[in-house]
């Protein structure tokens, strides 16, 4: 079974990973787990979450790292940086959104990838941010095994991740995202009612 680790820090943005987590968790070939610096974290929306793994005790093998944004990514924790750098070195598919992209920029981990984020101006003082490719002003960007997105793009973020991991056919992924973006009735107008033969 493939394993997705959702990296959530305290005050994580709970809306950013829900489309992806629910898609993965409904499949028999994927399992969803949480990892953090602390055993219990709270979301911006007030959800207390007991995480599955503490950084340093996470499984050695996993198939996807999803870094959920929030208010704690200005973190200089060495264990956190080592964990993320190791995932890059292992060429594990990685997805980062919102404040998590800021963390990657600050630590020079975007330099070899096309990328987006909340706003490039926020990174002007990051000494390690020396990208080969320019910042892309799009909701979400995929380059090789990395997806980045701004905090208002959970659906676009999910779409590119599902494509990156070959979750389903492009057509089926597009249908799933269409329903999430426009709702059930617009979906029925375009594709027909999935509950009626």
Curated annotation (Swiss-Prot):
InterPro entries: Class_I_gatase-like, DJ-1/PfpI, Prot/Nucl_acid_deglycase. GO terms for molecular function: peptidase activity. One of its GO terms (biological process) is proteolysis. One of its GO terms (cellular component) is cytoplasm. Residues 29-166 form the PfpI endopeptidase domain. Pfam families: DJ-1_PfpI. Its EC number is 3.2.-.-. It is an enzyme of class 3 (hydrolase). Keywords: Hydrolase, Protease. The active site is at residue 98. PANTHER family: DJ-1_PFPI DOMAIN-CONTAINING PROTEIN, PROTEIN/NUCLEIC ACID DEGLYCASE DJ-1-RELATED. Belongs to the peptidase C56 family. This is Uncharacterized protease YdeA.
């Amino acid at each position: 079974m493939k394993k997705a680790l959702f990296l959530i820090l305290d005050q994580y943005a709970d809306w950013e990973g829900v489309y992806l987590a629910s898609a993965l968790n409904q499949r028999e070939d994927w399992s969803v787990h949480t990892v953090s610096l602390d055993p219990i974290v709270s979301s911006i929306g007030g959800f207390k979450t007991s995480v599955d793994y503490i950084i340093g005790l996470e499984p050695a093998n996993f198939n996807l790292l999803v870094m959920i944004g929030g208010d704690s990514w200005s973190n200089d924790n060495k264990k956190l940086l080592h964990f993320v750098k190791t995932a890059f070195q292992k060429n594990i598919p990685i997805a980062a959104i919102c404040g998590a992209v800021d963390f990657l920029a600050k630590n020079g981990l975007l330099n070899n990838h096309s990328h987006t984020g909340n706003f490039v101006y926020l990174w002007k003082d990051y000494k390690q941010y020396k990208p080969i490719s320019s910042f892309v002003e799009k909701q979400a960007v995929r380059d090789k095994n990395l997806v980045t997105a701004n905090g208002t793009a959970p659906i676009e973020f999910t779409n590119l991740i599902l494509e990156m991991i070959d979750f389903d056919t492009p057509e089926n992924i597009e249908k799933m995202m269409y329903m999430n973006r426009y709702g059930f009735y617009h979906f029925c107008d375009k594709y027909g009612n999935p509950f009626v033969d």
